[in-house]
């Protein structure tokens, strides 16, 4: 089947198999930030933004993205660069959390801790738990608020 998908701002027109996963399509096109983890849509490593909404690309057929816009971390480096260091400073892994954090901050630039946890709930973190990510995002938001107030 023929599809047209805008990936990180670039239109890709291609013939694909109807059972091709979005994850495999994206990796074929150089989006290596999209990881294959559990393959059961439980871990969140494969999270991408489909028309701005986080989806698990290991459970989305490429055909579903036909006519839509997909963003991976490769296309959102500038937006992510503000807060990933804050997450890393907490010793927390960033696997899949970055895409959900971008979606959260676009929707709600001043989320509560419960709202942050709700957005991160789609990611399974066996390495560092969720508290490091929460602290990193909270520290980033505190930094941004201090900057806005001219205290940074």
Protein language model features and the residues they cover:
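Signature of N-terminal electron-transfer/Fe-S-associated modules in redox systems
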Residues: 1-152
């Amino acid at each position: 089947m023929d599809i047209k998908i805008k990936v990180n701002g670039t239109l890709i027109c291609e013939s694909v198999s109807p059972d091709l996963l979005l994850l495999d399509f994206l990796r074929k096109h150089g989006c290596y930030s999209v990881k294959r983890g559990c393959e059961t849509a439980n871990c969140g490593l494969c999270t991408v933004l489909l028309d701005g909404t986080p989806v698990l690309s290991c459970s989305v057929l490429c055909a579903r993205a036909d006519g839509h816009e997909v963003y991976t971390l490769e296309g959102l480096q500038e937006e992510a660069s503000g807060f990933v260091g804050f997450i890393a400073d907490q010793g927390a892994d960033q696997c899949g959390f970055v895409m959900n954090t971008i979606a959260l901050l676009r929707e709600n630039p001043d989320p509560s801790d419960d709202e942050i946890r709700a957005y991160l709930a789609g990611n399974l973190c066996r390495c560092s738990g969720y508290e490091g990510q929460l602290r990193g995002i909270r520290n980033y938001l505190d930094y941004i608020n201090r900057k806005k107030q001219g205290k940074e």
